């Protein structure tokens, strides 16, 4: 993690939250400080209309407490994911959103590089 220029975390939403294993992994990282000012993008997905937005908000809150560099344009919620993503990855709207998120993350990486 220390050598990574950025981190992308993608999670489903389970019972209006992030999976316990992801939370546990983040808890282990807290004391290391490896996410401090590290550019991060966070993505949630669910088969429902909420797109995992509750899990995404929870994840974003945890990452911000850890002082990760997580601007709003590096957050993405994907609703109805089971209908959108095919083996070919052909959902155009989702593809556009993912490209925009990656552009925002690259800008965040550039800003972090200039600041250090």
Task: Locate the predicted segments by residue.
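Glycine-rich phosphate/pyrophosphate-binding loop and the adjoining helix
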Residues: 69-116
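Helix-loop-strand module that forms the ligand-binding subsite of alpha/beta enzymes
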Residues: 1-67
